[in-house]
Amino acid sequence: MSTRIQRSRTRASALLASALLATGAAQAQQYINLPGTQPGGLAEGPPLENARSCGVTCHYSRDATMPSAMPYDGWSSSMMGNAMRDPLFLAALTIAEQDLPGSGDYCLRCHTPPGFVGGRTRSSAAASRGADLESADLDGVTCDSCHRMTETANLGNAQYVLSPTETRFGPYATINSIRHPGAASTWLADSRMCATCHEITNPAQPLLRADGTDTGQRYPIDTTYSEWSRSDYAVAGSPVAATCQDCHMPRIGAPGYSATNTTAMMRDNPRRHDFAGANAWGLRVLAAMRNDVTTGDFYDPEAVPFYEAGAARAEATLRSAVTLELRSAPTQADPGAPVEVVARITNRSGHRVPSGYTDGRRVWLEVALVDSSNRATVVSGAYDAAEAHLDETDPQLKLYEAVPGRVGVGREEHIALHNTTIRDTRLPPRGYRPLPGHEPVGADYSGGEGGALRHWDDARYTITLPATARGPVTVRVRARFQVTTREYVEFLARENRTDDRGRELLRRYEASGRAAPYDMAEATAVIMVGAPLPEDAGTVRDGGGADGAVVPAAASGGCSCHTAGDQPSARGGAGALFFALAAALSARRRRARRNDA
């Protein structure tokens, strides 16, 4: 699979001379021409159908409270179904078009296949930032965008090939439709199909190392597919083998469902069209837009519950992506003493964490001390919610992110001009062997099985206990995810010289909690401060500790399908606290009895 990606990238590079000739902002429109169905390519056949027509006539239940096999239910409230309404994407699109006129057309190949194939992304100078799109084009990755797609050897970079006929492809050979013929296709169940829009490089920019050395690759924008294809998740027979569809289009898990509301054919265990990812915040922004009468034909308060359900599914996906455990922590310590704590975060997803469009996305570990009154003092990974600011000056901060930039310039957010990776500390998936030039930068994940990168990271902290602390103190570690940062949003607003998209994004950002971090996983351990534990108090273990240390910890996060020896402790923070208090009380009673004797 990686060979096909390489061939596809080589072909794309060969087209550069006629595609993009310079990177100056004053140049004329220059479009990226790649294989696949071209603008006007369906002129001899039916155009891509309006997605709302698919939903209203056949594939919509209007019930957000139940698991639904109706494709429109999940799709319409997914980021795929709103790929041309996402305020963050639109703001970034305008900046890209300012920096490299014509580059927006390349983005729109994925974000609105109907608009691109319909010829409405090149029809004027402003078209490549979406100025000439029709209302139906705003539905993003529509039903026909996938269900008329045919297999191609050109993976990635939106090089899709669409059927010029009325036939819709799906998993079933027999359908009962009064609107269109159908045919079975294995392509829709193949992860290579997902590479179409989730393996994206910039044909206009090389990928350079920090010293300016050319890697021979193009600059990566979204490499989720190759992260998967070069991991154990893509290996048949692997204990973790799974396709993109297995995770992001889960099966309902029950018989007797129909994907239509007309002449239904019942299917057993069909797939949902939720396409749940990591962007719960984006879906809640879109829900607010659905409830805003100023958004025109997008205004639909009845659709809001579907977006809230989609956001909840995204949060569930985040919780399944990593596990967190305290591998080492002392069971007792003196007030004011420094203690050593080791936390392990493990990637349980089939790609890097975080993945996808990485500008602004990040995961970090927050470490806090929690006293018996449940007052928390953050000692590493502090996030100021009032300012939407993460303290990156913290010397112990564990931050997992990809930072783009330009050779000779450094870190910057002009996506169309990126040509180097300043930092890439994202967690690899299990068994990951990256493409040349895609290795971690600023982090060492060597030591995985069989020469692969490790899919976990051990974070070591030195924490000084409060001098006034007495009794049980809980060490709490949380893995926190943020889909975008204040700095990135403000950049998109500040640099916009063309339209109001940046300011509109900033307004929506301020009104929606500023993309507050979401806690993916948590682990805790209790330290008795100022009084030793009795010898017969017992211990609580959670997977052991470094150098045989006792670990009274509770771990959370990750999928529910744990293997033996990989189970989170059943004792949560409250249980561990109760245990510690009971042990201390028992010791006090024994001392009292000895004194009475």
Give the residues covered by each predicted segment.
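Cytoplasmic C-terminal tails of single-pass
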Residues: 593-597
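Bacterial N-terminal signal peptides
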Residues: 13-23, 578-584
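N-terminal module-boundary/linker segments of secreted carbohydrate-active enzymes
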Residues: 29-65
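Juxtamembrane/start-of-transmembrane alpha-helix segments at the extracytoplasmic/lumenal side
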Residues: 562-575
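C-terminal low-complexity, Ser/Thr- and acidic/Pro-rich disordered "stalk" regions positioned immediately N-terminal
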Residues: 532-564
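Primarily the internal scaffold of c-type cytochrome electron-transfer domains
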Residues: 30-38, 63-93, 124-443, 449-453, ...
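A cross-kingdom C-terminal cell-surface attachment/processing module
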Residues: 573-591
